[in-house]
Amino acid sequence: MIRLRLIGLAFLCVLVVPFPVIAGDFDGSKPLLFAAIDVIECGPNGECSRVSPESIALSQFFKIDFKKKKIFPVGESQEKKSTTIENMELIDGKLILQGAEDGVEGVRDGVGWTMAIAEETGKAVLTASGDQVGFVVFGACTPL
């Protein structure tokens, strides 16, 4: 009877151990690839419209490097277009990233941004706001 209980306990431990490993994909411990799926642009009059990532100079794919605290567009000059992750927190099952980007030098196009990544699924929402404009980007992340 004791042997059966020990085998049952060992089996239970084997089942429990892998779950934190799987959940760790979207907690900031591994680099991620983010794909922008839907992009919405809103103006001060309350009108919003769906736009393509290219129409707002947004790459469709980004590498998120948590160790370097950088986000790089994939397939473009990484140093020139990278942005810094200035704040990172785990809140209510979401990894929240925040930062600010100056954009093009000499042009008043800077934005503040926040990205929320669901720890369980990797689905993500990126919001960015600037002068008289706001953007919402729906997408998904996958571990690299």
Model region roles, listed by residue range:
Residues 1-6:
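Positively charged n-region of N-terminal signal peptides that target proteins for export
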Residues 7-18:
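Bacterial N-terminal signal peptides
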Residues 19-23:
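Sec/Tat signal peptide C-region and signal peptidase I cleavage site
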Residues 28-70, 108-109:
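Short, solvent-exposed loop/hinge segments that bridge or flank secondary-structure elements
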Residues 64-70, 91-94, 114-124, 143:
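Short, solvent-exposed coil/turn segments at beta-strand boundaries
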Residues 67-109:
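Contiguous, well-ordered beta-strand patches that form the walls/edges
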Residues 116, 124-135:
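Short, exposed beta-strand-loop hairpins at the edges of beta-sheets
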Residues 132-144:
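C-terminal partner/receptor-binding element of secreted or periplasmic proteins
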